[in-house]
């Protein structure tokens, strides 16, 4: 698998669930993801692109086919470029006419023509002419459409001179979605939209959208952003981000406004139903529903569109804050209760545990709250229960936890067992000087896996004034520190060396290139582009061992990605190195 190219840069800055806050850069312009692209129709500008830019929308999407088919727009775009045509300086992505193809059955342009046209008018992110097969089409039809899409992808790959989308199609057949994702992952594209889902979203078939997105994500390389084509209603954003969607586009802000519909994070309301505005955006702060109803239709539609945009933007910001705080699943749980079909989709997403668990951080800033039956199925909770079962059999002394069930008391100081809240109280038994080492060994077994406890045999544990274990030492040398915030172990140099001997290769290893070795030894962070291999079992925020190709220990630190991501990503930090280990 290639490491990609430099037309577009994408790196992950924070994460929760499969959701991520990323930095996307193209043509020297940067945005933070998750991001929403307002759809701009150059023939019907309900909100001017310049105003969108002032509102903080640093990326928009428009339709290159509409521009291509309109002689006046086409000639002007070719003369001055798309940015001057629209009066917008941010990132401009374009669709190719695929949506028109799905809606109306044909478009009067070839794949090569539209790709070359996109380059000539200076778009930042283009899209080739894929075939979006409608839901429930015969499988033979979906297969034939996908065959054409992949042929056009190969053609676009050969001629493209800009960053480009490669949409994953396949109708409602998850095996075709996986196949398309694998094939397109092997090609030189930058972003992967998941296409053909608008009819499903319009019909509230969110459960099927979950299966389509997860099937696609499972086969996609994880270093490329994913765009859920046509998903523009804020009620689905949190769920989609938890699946790993990075980009959205919204025409709904304008379409709903023209129909006197008012967006909220939970759904849509008709303007004539409202006595009060449940919002404090500039529009809702200035006008009452009655005042908007009395306005001329064109002005009313413009103001409703601006409100709808603020609601969309606010929900994206709320999601990003939830990711930062480790609270994304709580937000998804809350939003899912706005509609039975969304609730069904949320439950379906939790069925995809194997996919979700790979990206789920092992520790978070937030406590685990038992707020619903579904919260007991969150990936972090399920994983903690599975790991605890393994440790329980070795350490015994079980206690009943209101969220995690039977857990050895030696894990009850550690995240998430200690950092959790349920209806029933759970008391923590502090260690004694005599049994504190049992706590440390159980934590090691839970944190690093089978037999990791052997690295701490014979060690002594110093207790803090609070009675909690802190420093773990052997013969006066520090092996590890038990972190106050989450009860996990941060390795010292001696602890890393002992763990390295105990754990067979490649467990908890991140293998770096010869070029990165001297920097790792000096305690410098490891960047993903220098990672040659990593233990697939590594999860975000695990404590890991950095080694060279000879399995010589170079450093210890905290993983910022899963093991598989480290191998694929070209940009961003893979390991936050805590301590380097000098050679010799």
Swiss-Prot record:
Question: Which EC numbers does the record give?
Answer: 2.4.2.48
Superkingdom of origin organism: Archaea
Recorded hits in CDD domains, A to Z, give: PUA_archaeosine_TGT
- Which residues are named in the active-site annotation? 95 (nucleophile)
Q: Any note on cofactor binding?
A: Binds 1 zinc ion per subunit.
Q: Where is the PUA domain?
A: 507-582
Residues noted as binding substrate in the record, renumbered to the chain: 130, 196
For activity, the cofactor(s) needed are: Zn(2+)
Cellular component GO terms, alphabetical: cytoplasm
Q: One matching Pfam family, short form?
A: TGT_C2
The main enzyme category here is: transferase
PROSITE patterns tied to this protein:
PUA
GO biological process terms held by the UniProt record: tRNA wobble guanine modification
Record keywords: Glycosyltransferase, Metal-binding, Transferase, tRNA processing, Zinc
The pathway entry for this protein reads as: tRNA modification; archaeosine-tRNA biosynthesis
> Which InterPro entries does the protein's record reference?
ArchSynthase1/Queuine_TRR, ArcTGT_C1_sf, PUA, PUA-like_sf, PUA_sf, TGT-like_sf, TGT_C1, TGT_C2
Instruction: Name the Gene3D superfamilies for this protein.
Output: ArcTGT, C1 domain, ArcTGT, C2 domain, PUA domain, Queuine tRNA-ribosyltransferase-like
Residues binding Zn(2+) are: 279, 281, 284
Under the GO molecular function aspect, what terms does this record hold?
Answer: pentosyltransferase activity; RNA binding; zinc ion binding
Identify the HAMAP family for this entry: TgtA_arch
Q: Which family does it belong to?
A: Belongs to the archaeosine tRNA-ribosyltransferase family.
Could you tell me what this protein is called? tRNA-guanine(15) transglycosylase
């Amino acid at each position: 698998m290639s490491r990609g190219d430099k037309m577009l840069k994408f790196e992950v800055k924070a994460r929760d669930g499969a959701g991520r806050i990323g930095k996307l850069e193209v043509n020297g312009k940067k945005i933070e993801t998750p991001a929403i692209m307002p759809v701009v129709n150059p023939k019907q500008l309900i909100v001017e692109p310049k105003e969108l830019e002032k509102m903080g929308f640093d990326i928009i999407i428009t339709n290159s086919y509409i521009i291509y088919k309109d002689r006046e727009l086409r000639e002007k775009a070719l003369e001055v470029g798309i940015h001057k045509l629209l009066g917008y300086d941010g990132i401009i992505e374009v669709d190719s006419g695929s949506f028109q193809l799905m809606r109306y059955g044909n478009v009067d342009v070839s794949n090569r023509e539209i790709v070359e046209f996109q380059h000539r008018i200076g778009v930042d992110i283009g899209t080739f002419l894929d075939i979006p097969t409608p839901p429930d089409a015969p499988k033979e039809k979906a297969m034939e459409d996908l065959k054409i899409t992949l042929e056009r992808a190969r053609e676009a790959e050969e001629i493209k001179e800009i960053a480009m989308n490669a949409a994953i199609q396949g109708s409602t057949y998850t095996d075709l979605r996986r196949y398309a994702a694998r094939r397109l992952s092997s090609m030189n594209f930058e972003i992967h939209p998941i296409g053909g889902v608008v009819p499903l979203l319009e019909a509230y078939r969110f459960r099927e959208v979950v299966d389509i997105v997860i099937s696609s994500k499972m086969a996609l390389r994880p270093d490329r952003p994913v765009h859920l084509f046509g998903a523009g209603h804020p009620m689905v954003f949190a769920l989609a981000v938890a699946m790993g969607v990075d980009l959205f586009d919204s025409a709904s802000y304008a379409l709903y406004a023209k129909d006197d519909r008012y967006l909220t994070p939970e759904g849509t309301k008709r303007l004539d139903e409202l006595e009060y505005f449940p919002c404090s955006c500039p529009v809702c702060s200035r006008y009452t529903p009655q005042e908007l109803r009395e306005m001329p239709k064109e002005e009313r539609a413009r103001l409703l569109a601006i409100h709808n945009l603020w609601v969309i933007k606010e929900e994206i910001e709320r999601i990003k804050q939830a990711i930062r705080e480790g609270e994304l699943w709580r937000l998804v749980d809350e939003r899912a209760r706005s509609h039975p079909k969304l609730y069904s989709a949320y439950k379906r997403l939790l069925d995809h545990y194997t996919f979700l668990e790979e990206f789920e951080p092992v520790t978070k800033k937030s406590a685990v709250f038992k707020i619903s039956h579904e919260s007991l199925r969150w990936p972090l909770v399920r994983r903690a229960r599975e790991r605890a079962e393994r440790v329980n059999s070795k350490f015994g002394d079980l206690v009943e936890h209101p969220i995690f069930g039977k857990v050895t008391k030696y894990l009850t100081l550690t995240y998430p067992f200690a950092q959790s809240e349920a209806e029933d109280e759970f008391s923590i038994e502090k260690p004694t000087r005599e049994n504190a080492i049992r706590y440390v060994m159980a934590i090691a077994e839970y944190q690093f896996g089978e037999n990791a406890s052997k690295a701490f045999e014979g060690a002594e544990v110093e207790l803090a004034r609070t009675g909690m274990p802190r420093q773990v030492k052997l013969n006066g040398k520090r092996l590890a520190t038990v972190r106050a915030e989450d009860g996990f172990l941060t390795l010292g140099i001696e602890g890393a060396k002992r763990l390295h001997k105990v754990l067979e290769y490649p467990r908890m290893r991140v293998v770096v290139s010869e070029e990165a070795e001297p920097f790792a030894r000096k305690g410098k962070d490891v960047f993903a582009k220098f990672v040659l291999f990593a233990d697939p079992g590594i999860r975000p925020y695990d404590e890991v061992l950095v080694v060279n190709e000879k399995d010589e220990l170079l450093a210890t630190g905290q993983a910022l990605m899963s093991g598989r991501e480290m191998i694929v990503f070209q940009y961003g930090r893979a390991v936050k190195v805590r301590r380097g280990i000098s050679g010799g």
